[in-house]
Amino acid sequence: ALMMKPGDKSGPRDAYFLDVQKALIAAGIAMPTMVVDRTRLNANIDTLKGFLPPGMGYRIVAKSLPSLGLIDHIRKRTGTGRLMTFNLPMLLEISQAMPEASQLLGKPLPVQAARQYFEQLPLEVSGAADNVQWLVDTPERVMQYAALADEFGRELALNVELDVGLHRGGVVPGEVLGAMLAAIKAHPRLSFAGFMGYDPHIPSLPTAMGWRERAMKGVRKTYADALVQAGGVFGADAMAGITRNAAGSPTYRTYQDTEIASEVSAGSCLVKPTHFDTELLEPHVPASFIATPVIKSLPVTHMPGLEFADGATRAWNPNASKTVFIYGGNWLADPVDPPGLEYNKTFGRSSNQEMLNGGPDLEISPDEFVFLRPHQSEAVFLQFGDIAVYEDG
């Protein structure tokens, strides 16, 4: 049993986080805040650019970086005009702020949402709609978008979602894909924009016995067969200019030539939440943190109704010695500084004042900051107001 006894994880604070804390206090920030480190973000952008093979395009995944300022900065540093968007508000916002940007839908939008896009798009940025590629996954959806094109008298560029092994919908080469391509070709207001094949399942497959390698070959074969099938319908000239979109942050490094994909999508690897701590993304560094003020810092942990067990709990687990209550909480995130902080499973989570416990060497006062690393960026970033950009103190 002593083998299972937790060791004390508390200790001195990380100098990096003390510097960020100093900057937050100097800026007068006193509420839960999403912090993005510009130096680290830029390093991640440069890492991504460095891994792209010659001729490979890059598309920014807007849902993973849900801030126009952030997207604009990444566009400038990468020189890309390509974005992947995922819902109606995002599509409208980017169409107005960046009407010249190419937007590829990352999931098929219900046709009613696409209709609302055309209804709500301001006249002065009407041309932004010509830069949108609408994702379609079934023959039925192609027909819905054909009717929409007629309704608004607009030409729509359709991108076909391929199932390259994720099995989250999309189509495989064969009869159904043939019907979709034929329907697009037959309609005067529809054009074939290309394919999207998303493969985030790859890194979770074991490398043992060649499983991952086989799956990657499967991705490439499915994509290659779809390209051949589309070439038979539209001809070589039309195929030369299509979008061949692939990957995501977890797999962009596996595309080492432009034989299959002409562009890769990525977003999360630029801020690197914990779900992206994978071997392929090891060269990327965490660049986003939740910073939240300490409301109360207590020298001893007392559990409501279980006070009789407090001493025994501390003796068994030194990391339960002290308590802090933070401003807010219950985020998809893990505490990273001060070191050794843990959620209290017995007390439970709280969105108002979350309890965190630490060991005997935990030193933090009210109004100082606890730092947490988000698990993902897309949902977590949107829970905060303006992003605080940190750079060299």
Task: Describe each PLM feature range.
Residues L2-K5, Y16-M34:
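Generic N-terminal amphipathic, Lys/Arg-enriched alpha-helix
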Residues R214, P250-F325:
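Active-site loop ensemble at the mouth of alpha/beta enzyme cores that anchors a bound cofactor
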Residues F17, L166, M196-P203, A261-L270, ...:
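Active-site pocket-lining/capping segments in soluble small-molecule metabolic enzymes
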Residues L41, K63, I94, V160, ...:
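Conserved, mostly hydrophobic/aromatic
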Residues A26-D37, A101-L104, P122-W134, P206-K217:
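Glycine-rich tight-turn/loop motif centered on a GG-T
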Residues Y58-S204:
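Active-site-proximal beta-alpha core segment in soluble small-molecule metabolic enzymes
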Residues A157, D163-E282:
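Active-site loop/helix belt of alpha/beta enzymes
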Residues V300-G393:
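C-terminal accessory subdomain/extension
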